């Protein structure tokens, strides 16, 4: 999509606007790959231009682009930032760093820029490792996080209208949304085969870049079995002991509980899965075990199961969960007796 044609996602822009000029706070946008974080940054930049900020003071650094693929250390990142900010003029500068988690131990540098003042910093990242270092744990680190999701159904219709595609809500269009999910780029692809290929490629990149490679998983086949299980059983109550028994007796795969827990945490950190805890409505206490796991996008299920038919119950539940999370709610599964 051309940079002049960006669908503005007001839900997230409205959360960021109060902090546009806050050079004492680092704005962190997290979410699964291809959910629209880069376009959100460009929307912020467009609004800054509309407010009269000079182009020289709006600086982008996309670490997934070819010219920055070799930037992997804090020193290399520092030199890259110095280079792109060399022409910045007087007044507040706006620094946008996309996919910053590609650089190991980036936090001290970003905090140093914040402490120097005069620069409003925006970061994006595709996983929870982004918020696990000095940015959070050191007293000097101050940040505000905006969690981003793929398109909700209303956003999906809004983007189709923006692109000049049929956008009147209908059972057929809603079924298409449930099946293919809300990865923004897929909404502009009319051909069904091309759209499926795009979603499959996105999911493959997520697993390769944010899970397998980054965490150096030794037994990839075992990890694949685990991730397949959780993707195929999304929105269902999950008991780790039952998962271990299933893998052992049904797929003849042995796995230790700590290994299963580790792999599950990796899928959560990569924003592929979201854990929804159980809550007892009678005692008003959180319950241990039986948590549900929802997909970041229902298109992940379709991409990993080429000929599978969508099951409306779990899909509707998943869409409702991500819709509520995107609106800023904390969600749990309420239980009273045997009912939920």
Where are the regions that the model predicts?
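N-terminal pre-Walker A segment at the start of P-loop NTPase domains
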Residues: 1-17
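Interdomain motor-coupling "hinge/lid" segment immediately C-terminal to the ATP-binding subdomain
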Residues: 2, 126-128, 133-237
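Hydrophobic anchor at the beta1->P-loop junction of P-loop NTPases
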Residues: 29
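Conserved lysine of the Walker
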Residues: 37
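Hydrophobic positions on the alpha1 helix immediately C-terminal to the Walker A/P-loop
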Residues: 40
